[in-house]
């Protein structure tokens, strides 16, 4: 399984909760996948500030270390990277032990591959104060155990998780997590936001347009595109004569563009000929005001119009020239054959002159 597949696993059972405008989040995601007969489980850990990945650890790397994934975190000193590498390696070992323990809880054989996922993080409001902390575990794609919003108790997702819940309650593990989330997590988030403010606090507005896709003679699909925006949160809504059509439209998940920005589209099937009655409303914090877009039928380009005008002139000119030639031939015939054929050296000049429209 490649790094991309492992990263996709991170967003499977562990649900990403949206941050509101003006708020920010620090999140760490970890995944361990057992692979019987192929050695130790693979462990991957990534860190995000808002929608931006800034660190990554991969146990399968030639020299496994916590590595930067954003320029603004590269300024951290060697002690930072050594400490986070030690923490990641310790987490990897804990995950390997936990995979074996959970396999026993579920009475599973050693032959199958299993996945353990973990997410931990904090959200702060515009004032920088903690708004919410969270920690979740997932096993084989299902919720296993989660810290409640009070940061003092746990919710078990499955019967087998009750065993872990009792252990953690006895050990006071909720208090340990609460102290981290209310203290260290918030402090590091503030530091990252300050160091990476040029990137993390920016608001890139979307570039939006509508495309037209005929389905049949009676229906077409209108697709509203929003490209190149940051942060991730955006709203696309189709309207018919001003009324929202959210129930009927197809809306894809926001996707990374690969350059630090995001993209999204919303589509709606409409009757052919009624396209101008439908508008797409785009809302994003990078916009001073929402955009309202319609599908614009393609207009003939300047080049196309020039070609058309040129062809018309050519046809008209050709007709005039043909008329002049016929007239001259008739006159020559009337004068008894005084027409003299031009030499080959004169014929090129004659052709240029003949393209001139004669005065009348």
Swiss-Prot record:
It is a single-pass type I membrane protein. InterPro entries: Ig-like_dom (IPR007110), Ig-like_dom_sf (IPR036179), Ig-like_fold (IPR013783), Ig/MHC_CS (IPR003006), Ig_C1-set (IPR003597), MHC_class-I_related (IPR050208), MHC_I-like_Ag-recog (IPR011161), MHC_I-like_Ag-recog_sf (IPR037055). Coiled coil: none annotated. PROSITE patterns: IG_LIKE, IG_MHC. The chain crosses the membrane at residues 309-328. Residues 112-203 are annotated as: Alpha-2. Residues 296-308 are annotated as: Connecting peptide. It comes from the Eukaryota. Involved in the presentation of foreign antigens to the immune system. This is BOLA class I histocompatibility antigen, alpha chain BL3-6. It comes from Bos taurus.
